[in-house]
Amino acid sequence: MIDIKLPLTDLHRHLDGNIRPETILDLANQHNIQLPANDLESLLPHVQIIENEPSLVSFLQKLDWGVAVLADLDACRRIAIENVEDAINTGLDYAELRFSPYYMAMNHKLPVEGVVEAIIDGIRSARQNNDIDIRLIGILSRTFGEQACTQELTSLLAHQQHITALDLAGDELGFPGHLFQSHFTKARDAGWHITIHAGEAAGAESIWQAIRELGATRIGHGVKAITDPVLMDYLVENRIGIETCLTSNLQTSTVNSLLDHPLKQFLEKDILASINTDDPAVEGIDIRHEYEIAAPAAGLSIAQIRQAQINGLETAFISDTEKQALRMKAANR
């Protein structure tokens, strides 16, 4: 279902949600960190979704063991490198990897800015001699409150030339977007693009808030947009992209089944919705699964899947010149 003559993108891919289970075991052994299991088979149910979770918050708990083993900055650098390797191995031409430096730092009280530096260095190292375009998106983890987000933002701004965009993720219901308006004003002043997790756990009003108050030009998940026809018209008219994550939305019980997912309706409406992974290691999937299994299960036609692939590049946070270079690369395959 993937058109190899088109660039393959993944715009919504959490670096800290894609820590290999084997790496979790290895780092735990290196740093004498107690895990709930000592072998891969027994560990998997603790770090990967086996059955759909009842909520977003319970889904996010599966990420916690991955960051629990980040005992030093070398570990952070390693997972950045492995994320690029995974992106290459799954056939991506372009990926935007997002990460929350505070979340990655907090278990072992690592310097938050040091985590940012380690991720940047790991990405730079892994990209050498590899034909893949990687951009970084910083995340403010709303779950930890405004003060922690201020610390995250300061650390990200210290390396602003290496960061493409800013995101707000975490407990959407408990920490609504209006709490972080000043953070995103600073991000826009720095020249960053804005993408916001919205309309996943909360309703359409959260998406409106992300656009109007935080300046989002892309929305992560955005499932609840389907409940607001005026919002859907606004998304079309203003070319605001929706970063769809099919399997993730099923596993968080945001939708009851893939056939209930609104992606098909978004595409019929000409909303710039794309197909993305979210947390590949936690979900036990890759981008090919989303295109070849999840998208058809969500009722998408081959033409709609192709359009979603086109939308991925169209809404990527890069210049038109860079997009055209990726198109030429794919066309010549």
Swiss-Prot record:
It is an enzyme of class 3 (hydrolase). CDD domains: ADA. Zn(2+) binds at residues 12, 14, 197, 278. Its EC number is 3.5.4.4. Binds 1 zinc ion per subunit. GO terms for cellular component: cytosol. GO terms for molecular function: 2'-deoxyadenosine deaminase activity; adenosine deaminase activity; zinc ion binding. Pfam families: A_deaminase. It catalyses: adenosine + H2O + H(+) = inosine + NH4(+); 2'-deoxyadenosine + H2O + H(+) = 2'-deoxyinosine + NH4(+). GO terms for biological process: adenosine catabolic process; hypoxanthine salvage; inosine biosynthetic process; nucleotide metabolic process; purine ribonucleoside monophosphate biosynthetic process. Gene3D superfamilies: Metal-dependent hydrolases. The record marks 221 as: Important for catalytic activity. Substrate binds at residues 14, 16, 170, 279. Keywords: Hydrolase, Metal-binding, Nucleotide metabolism, Zinc. SUPFAM superfamilies: Metallo-dependent hydrolases. Its cofactor is Zn(2+). The active site is at residue 200. PROSITE patterns: A_DEAMINASE. InterPro entries: A/AMP_deam_AS, A_deaminase, A_deaminase_dom, Ado/ade_deaminase, Metal_Hydrolase. It comes from the Bacteria. Belongs to the metallo-dependent hydrolases superfamily. Adenosine and AMP deaminases family. Adenosine deaminase subfamily. This is Adenosine deaminase. It comes from Photorhabdus laumondii subsp. laumondii (strain DSM 15139 / CIP 105565 / TT01).
